Regions:
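Short solvent-exposed coil/turn linkers within tandem alpha-helical repeat scaffolds
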Residues: 2-10, 25, 40-48, 75-84, ...
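Specific register positions within alpha-helical solenoid repeats of the TPR/Sel1-like families, i.e.
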Residues: 23, 59, 93-97, 135
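TPR/TPR-like (Sel1-like) alpha-helical repeat modules
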Residues: 96, 102-120, 127-131
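Intrinsically disordered, low-complexity, charge-biased linker/tail regions
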Residues: 4, 8, 135-149
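"A position-specific structural signal for the A-helix of alpha-solenoid helical repeats
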Residues: 17, 53, 90, 128-129, ...
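Residue-level detector of the short coil/turn that links helix A to helix B
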Residues: 6, 26, 62, 99-100
Length: 149
């Protein structure tokens, strides 16, 4: 109805809400359809919580590259929301564990570490991700084994 009246803003708002409803109902196909309709109508700033759930849904479906893209875009569009840190961690994890892109993983983890948002709850995960990405890049030894004289 909003679309037919040319009220794009209202259409985007309702479409984002529908997407959230479908995500909560675990209807991935309908949620994805809503997300695509939102994007195709020019929506660029989906609410961070909904966007994070879309990225997680894609990750669950093993659509890792698209999930990484959505995590990354979420972090760029909503840099001042806590979901941005979670998105950076998700993108870093995917780059490191699923996409074999440790340099990108390191960039995401470092961006999370540099975030001005409070993130003490995630600091250990961030630091572990940085260490693991550096190890994958050969920047630090994986383990230090004592040698016998």
């Amino acid at each position: 109805m909003h679309w037919r009246r040319g009220d794009i803003r209202a259409y985007l708002e309702v479409t984002a809400q529908l997407c959230q409803v479908h995500l909560r109902a675990q209807d991935a196909e309908a949620a994805w359809s809503d997300f695509e309709a939102y994007r195709n109508a020019g929506g660029e700033k989906l609410p961070a919580s909904v966007w994070l759930d879309i990225a997680r849904m894609l990750e669950t479906q093993q659509n890792f590259d698209r999930a990484r893209t959505e995590y990354q875009q979420l972090a760029e569009v909503h840099p001042n929301e806590k979901q941005a840190i979670l998105a950076l961690l998700g993108a870093g994890r995917l780059c490191l564990k699923r996409l074999n892109r440790p340099e990108d993983a390191l960039r995401h983890y470092r961006a999370a570490a540099a975030s001005p948002l409070p993130h003490l709850d995630w600091e250990s995960n961030i630091q572990a991700g940085i260490r693991e990405a550096e190890q994958a890049l050969g920047k630090t030894p994986a383990t230090v084994t004592p040698t016998k004289p």
